[in-house]
Amino acid sequence: MSITGENIRNIAVIGHSGEGKTTLCEAMLFNGGAVDRQGKVMDGTTVTDFDDLEKSKKMSVYTACAYLMWKDTKINLIDLPGFYDFEGERHEGLRAAGGALLVIGANGVLPIGAESVVDYCLRLGKPLIIFINGMDKENADYFGTVRALKEKYAGKLAPIQIPIMENGKMQGCINALQEKAYRFTADGAEEIPIPDELKAQVEEMQANLMETAAENDEVLLDKYFESGELTREETIHGIRLGIASVNTIPVMAGSALQNRGVINLLNEIVAYMPQANERTNTLATDLAADKVVNIQPDPAAPLAAQVFKTVIDPYSGKLSYLKVFRGALKSGSTVWNANAEREERIGQVYVLRGKKTEPVSELSAGDIGAVNKLGVTSTGDTLCDINAKVKFDAIHFPKPTLFMAVSAEKKGEEDKVFAGLSKLAEEDYTFSVEKNAETGEILIGGQGDTQIEMLVKKVKTRYGVDMKLTEPKIAYRETIRAVASAEGKYKKQTGGHGQYGHCKIRFEPCGEPFIFDEEVVGGAVPKQYFPAVEKGLRESLVSGPLAGYPVTGLKAVLYDGSYHEVDSSEMAFKAAAALAFKEGLKNCLLYTSPSPRD
């Protein structure tokens, strides 16, 4: 199945945890015929929350992709976790998305995290639709939620729907752009006349939409000033321009759980969100010309694709999610990995529907899919034509903010623990694992308690090893508060040539871990011995004189000394520097402090 870019929409589904993102994805998949029945998060039966951890926690933890067909258009849904600890998943998914669908509850307030995720999409230039969910609940407050959004995004917000409420619940909706009303039925929705009591609201919303449309196009703006109105087609055209330029954010409403308003949403995604061949601001470096170029989504051009996520399964191996930005990725082809600077053999190409993979012959420009068992490819890598080498910018992930020590419950399984955690670090670039040489501990870092808890459980599930978490031991450093000078003289006489090295060194506090400099005049210490002095000092940094901790924040300046034409050697000056270090730091008001992380 190869579909061209004009018939593809790549939509990241975003929002805070618990707002109904996965349920909305499930409803869209059901309406598109991708599933026979609409699964539920609470039952663990949804397409995009397929991992055992997600099923047990009743929340999205990993990025998942699933496609559906709607009106001859392929919609690739990218379901992103909403919890803060999994922010890295958002960075991955939005790299592949052409637009975003923000899901928020109809609670009359701006939800936690909504502002940051909207702002992030706007910075990336990702067109956005807002879906106010939960309109089946009693006292659902659509207009209160719209007002809360307008307080932050007044100049961009464009509500296009009016809910038809009965007994506090949404029973239908009016599309002000299309000037049509619908009542929800068991099979979807049926068109009805616009209720008389809502006609004034419809007219007011239409007037606002005309004004918004006019602001997105100079020709429309001139006509609007002259006549005070626009045709329906002109209004729709102006709104679409505004969405594409992220100047306009349309707002819709419904109930994902009850599958109400979802068909209207699918229609608007096809009508208003960018076609995959419309996004022309994708930049990459042309490696031959050494310049930044704009990658046009031309299916006939040489291949340019990027891996945006990696999943490693202990049984089936590595699965690389990718988006084709240009050309076509074909099963059985050989491509160039611009990051690893090596060829990569492509086996079978797949499209994704949750955990299910469907084999295809190729992915055309604008499409999203996956390839398994790539040898040298990691998240963020560029795959391209070997005769047209380009490289996309790396995906920038937040650095770990919480660090814990981890150990095996059973003695002798530490290597198994480290290997399992290292595999997870290949999947999640916000997670780090290292062995601390000073404390002997395995240290892991992540975005928060929830992420670390999930990763530990995942290692147990995948690799059958139990672990325990503890606070990391503190690795201390020694540093100095004052300036001091010292000399070191290494003199040794044996039967033949002796050993002689003599140096005078000034030690000062500094902001860098270590700086070596020299101020020797008159050749008191020949230049060929400067590296030996520096090496002797660097080797001495490993163990300070106060408590044996590594020394940091030290500047050492070699300013004088002496040498012997016959007996001096690099070894002698290295030893002399070590003696000066030991003597000098005794007089520098040493103190210890916890080791800062890079």
Language-model region placement:
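Structural and coupling elements of P-loop NTPases
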Residues: 1-593
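A short, hydrophobic C-terminal helix/tail in secreted or cell-surface proteins
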Residues: 594-598
